[in-house]
């Protein structure tokens, strides 16, 4: 064998080994690519599902927040309506002193006080109302209605209009809340 043949033989052997190594590593590279592509696809699917679940959860949270905010706004509006209704009721009750029925109401208060506390009870009323009631004493703190004390001062009836309103205010508020349409 000549030197040229030996070199050819070595070159051929080298080329065959290079080709064999290339084939072997090409297969490995292809397998790695497929494995990586599969993992990438799996990860993409996982995160796509996770994203959809997160979006669904976020949407649910936002819907719940909107419902809560809506209820809160409705409740606040109802509170405003009830407050306005109570203010109007208070205004009308306090202005009953200007009505034609007020003298009759005042007489009824006095009669109840006398029946409950006795003939000798002390009655206090506003200056203008005291003039309408026999033996009543004027009290500038009273804007309408009366306060009556038993002779021994152990019992009292408070028929002042603002006290009456305070006593019925919670019931009125409940009534208004129940009758407000949603």
Curated annotation (Swiss-Prot):
Query: Which Gene3D superfamilies does UniProt cross-reference here?
Result: ATP synthase, E subunit, C-terminal
Q: What GO CC annotations are associated with the protein?
A: plasma membrane; proton-transporting two-sector ATPase complex, catalytic domain
Q: Is the Cell membrane keyword given for this protein?
A: yes
> Where, subcellularly, is it found?
Cell membrane
Q: Name one GO molecular function term.
A: proton-transporting ATP synthase activity, rotational mechanism
Topology of the protein relative to the lipid bilayer: Peripheral membrane protein
Could you name the domain of life of the organism this protein comes from? Archaea
What are the entry keywords?
ATP synthesis, Cell membrane, Hydrogen ion transport, Ion transport, Membrane, Transport
- GO biological process: any one? proton motive force-driven plasma membrane ATP synthesis
Is Membrane included in the keywords of this UniProt record? Answer: yes
Give the InterPro entries listed for this entry.
ATPase_E_C (IPR038495), ATPase_V1_Esu (IPR002842)
What is the purpose of this protein? Component of the A-type ATP synthase that produces ATP from ADP in the presence of a proton gradient across the membrane.
Q: How does it assemble?
A: Has multiple subunits with at least A(3), B(3), C, D, E, F, H, I and proteolipid K(x).
Q: Which family does this protein fall into?
A: Belongs to the V-ATPase E subunit family.
- Name the HAMAP family on file: ATP_synth_E_arch (MF_00311)
Report the NCBIfam families cross-referenced here. PRK01194.1 (NF002264)
Specify the protein name: A-type ATP synthase subunit E
Gene that this polypeptide is encoded by: atpE
